[in-house]
Amino acid sequence: MEKRTLLAVILSITVFYVFSLLFAPEKKPVQPESTGQAVSAPVSAGQPVAGGVQPSASAPSLPATAQQQDVTVRTGLYTAVFCSRGGALKSLTLKNYREKNLPDAQAVVLGSDADPSALTFSTRASGFNLPEGAPFVADATAVTMAGGEKKQLVFTHNSGQGFTVRKIYTFSGDSYGIKLDTQVFNNMAVPLVGTVQQVMTYPGLVKAKDSRFETAGSYLFSDNSLESDKLKDVSSASKLYDKNLQWSGFADKYFLTAILSEGGSIASVELRKNGAGFLESTVSSPRITVTPGQSVTVVHRLFVGPKDIDILKAQGNSLEQSLDLGWFTVIAKPLLYTLKYFYRYVGNYGVAIIIITIILKALFFPLTHKSYKSMKDMQKIQPMMAALKEKYKDDREGMNKAVMELYRDHKVNPLGGCLPMLVQIPVFFALYKALMFSIELRHAPFYFWITDLSGPDNLFGQMLGLPFVIGPLPLLMGATMFIQQKMTPSTMDPMQAKMMLALPVVFTFMFLNFPSGLVLYWLLNNILTIGQQMYINKLVND
């Protein structure tokens, strides 16, 4: 029985690990009947949409065409470059984040002037003639503000067909959030009916990678559920989401670009692979009706910045759900909040990890004690178990009955050593996710040679031509795992025991490329477990 329970534990851990990394729930989006059409209740002419401005009878007078121009916006947090093509965002440089963990490394740049996929929040329309990439004219060549200040940048498109579209970006010097008012002025003699669309293209402003650990792609929050799509998941046939949309955007491991609904201003989001092979997201407003001489405003909020859980939560609309921590999110996010709480006091995320590890070990001590005692009890009755197996080697039913009587007589629960450990598995995976995908640990130093808790321990670099770096932390982790294994009571036969000795070696190689913050947690957890076992041994022997 002990062999079977041990095997069950190992298989459970393996299945949880592989399944949580490689698989996600299947999404069931609605297939659209036609491209780019939003379905919603009509809005009365002359009324603002989703908290927009009051109706206006006159549109700004500008030429129908204008020379392409770029506008630079500088705040305390970022430098953004907008262009007149679609009134779109081309690139954004995050001043507080660096590409590499080096003193002279450049700041993180999202997007590129040379990348045709980088135009984000480009405006077009369905139902009236505003094509993608339509020329807009900016009211400034540069906008600069300090923290706490608010300033605007206005792009205007004169269609030459009796209507004008104006995009008003409102920036805050101390926020990654941007307000976008899209105004449609109708100077024609007939009503103007259609939908306003904001277009984003992947990879656009995110770092496009595709692996188990880099979950870059499209994310949106629809009907209280997070939906995600990678480029490979979307064909030329589009996917349509149109239920209770809160936000939509593109994200990678650490950064997010999103458009947020303001009072229901997102009616649908359509995903498709465009002719250039990029993943395109079209965010459509409810259908608007602009009567002659009036205007309608569609309001959105934008976000381009780090996936810091506090920053995301402050934006509202459940934007913090973009920090997808897998099946154990309900445990992982409280652990992440706890990690940040201790960081505020100690000023070092490595120390905060140590504090959390000690607290978790103390909380689980009763379970560990019970598990260890149960294994000790099982070890004591092994000679009697062996005798029963020999006695009933040709009578399986008789052997099972005798074994159960042996358990009952000695008050031993064969699952007593397994169940307490299974309870701790979700906590481990939750902490694993929190440490693996937390931007807080990105380039965060610990002490001594560990300068980046989000990267592997690479003190010794690549040795002996191996394709990975080597450092002391994973080696120490493997050594402590071996010591812990030798101290743990075992009822396995010699062959199984020898096979189990390979586990520390396997885990050491696995952890060579893991974030050093996670290896630090595992190492300290092993050390505390060794201390626990020494203490419990003393209690049991006494």
From Swiss-Prot:
Keywords: Cell inner membrane, Cell membrane, Chaperone, Membrane, Protein transport, Transmembrane, Transmembrane helix, Transport. It is found in: Cell inner membrane. GO terms for molecular function: membrane insertase activity. CDD domains: 5TM_YidC_Alb3, EcYidC-like_peri. Residues 54-64 have a biased composition (Low complexity). Residues 33-64 are annotated as: Disordered. It is a multi-pass membrane protein. GO terms for biological process: protein insertion into membrane; protein transport. Pfam families: 60KD_IMP, YidC_periplas. The chain crosses the membrane at residues 5-25, 323-343, 345-365, 419-439, 463-483, 500-520. Required for the insertion and/or proper folding and/or complex formation of integral membrane proteins into the membrane. Involved in integration of membrane proteins that insert both dependently and independently of the Sec translocase complex, as well as at least some lipoproteins. Aids folding of multispanning membrane proteins. Interacts with the Sec translocase complex via SecD. Specifically interacts with transmembrane segments of nascent integral membrane proteins during membrane integration. Belongs to the OXA1/ALB3/YidC family. Type 1 subfamily. This is Membrane protein insertase YidC. The gene is yidC.
